[in-house]
Amino acid sequence: MIEDDPSIADMYRVQLEHDGYRVTVATTAELGFITVAENSPDLVLLDLLLPDRSGFEVLISLNERLPNHPPVVILSNYGEPSMIDRGRSLGAVEYLVKSRVTPADISSQIPTWIAVGRRGGQGES
C-alpha cells in the first residue's frame, strides 16, 4: 500500500491483515516504487495525493520501468470522472473513492483484482 496518511494506512492494514493478507505500507511515491520493485507484491493499493509525487506519476513510472508490475488499485479522495478515467487509462484495475468503500469491501475484492492483473486486464470492475 502506498499511502501517506498513517491513520488511513492503519485502518486498511488492520482489516487486510485480519483477512490473512501481508501488508507493507510505503508513505511516499519513491518508497512505494522501491517497495514494489524489490518485493513484487500481488497487488498495489495506491493513493493519489502523496508528499513527493502524485499517485499517477507512480503508476506511470511502474508502467515505464516495471512493465510486468502487479495490478494497481487507486484509492483516492478524488471522485471526479476525469480522475477516474485517467487512472484507468494508465492501467489501474480499479479506481475507488475512499469515502465510498470500507476496508472490508476492499479486502473482499482483492482476489478479483489479482486475477484481473494476472490476465493482463485493466480498468475492469
Regions found by a protein language model. Give the residues of each.
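Conserved acidic carboxylate
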Residues: 3
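Two-component/phosphorelay signaling modules centered on CheY-like receiver
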Residues: 6-24
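Short amphipathic alpha-helix used as the core "switch/output" element in two-component signaling
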Residues: 34, 56-68
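Acidic, metal-coordinating helix/loop segments flanking the phosphotransfer/catalytic sites
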Residues: 25-43
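As written
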Residues: 55, 88-94
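Active-site residues of response regulator receiver
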Residues: 47, 76
